[in-house]
């Protein structure tokens, strides 16, 4: 988390002071070079109000669809059956938010079809390189998602929980599901907000010949968009800016 800049001192000066205070052996410096560089880049981005938001979660929960809904057009490829994203891809979001110069929305690979160690490494990489993480669920939270959430929080990463595909349930069922997710969250995550959305809702359409087809409907991501529109207030409450 990035704290307010002390009066009269630049972020560059603070960053240099921090790097000089690191008590690392030559081997440790080589080993942690990537992490130190990532943190340095993040500090400079936040100083200039350039924010990177990552969509993160299991394969097929609708990460790409959510980002497309925020863009209001298809900019990320989707595959309904198995998920499509193989590597992180970021695109500038042309959406005006007060006090922010730019926002990059980033699609990340799914975490459910990779080995446990690699999955943990991916969660850590997301924690290091992005300023806010949207952890997307499409049902009750799983042990894989809880573990990834703990890694993100333990590394100081602000997280919003997003429950997608809410068009599939009745309102009372959504309420019960949200409560179940809250009950399963670890203590360090109890205060995290859970937003309910439908990134790519579909409904059955009956044709005159009796055939039934699935028809795409308008996305419902207004609650999430409204939260992001609060700009600095949202990012302060999440811990991006203090």
Name each region found by the language model.
Residues 1-113:
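Conserved G1/Walker A P-loop phosphate-binding module
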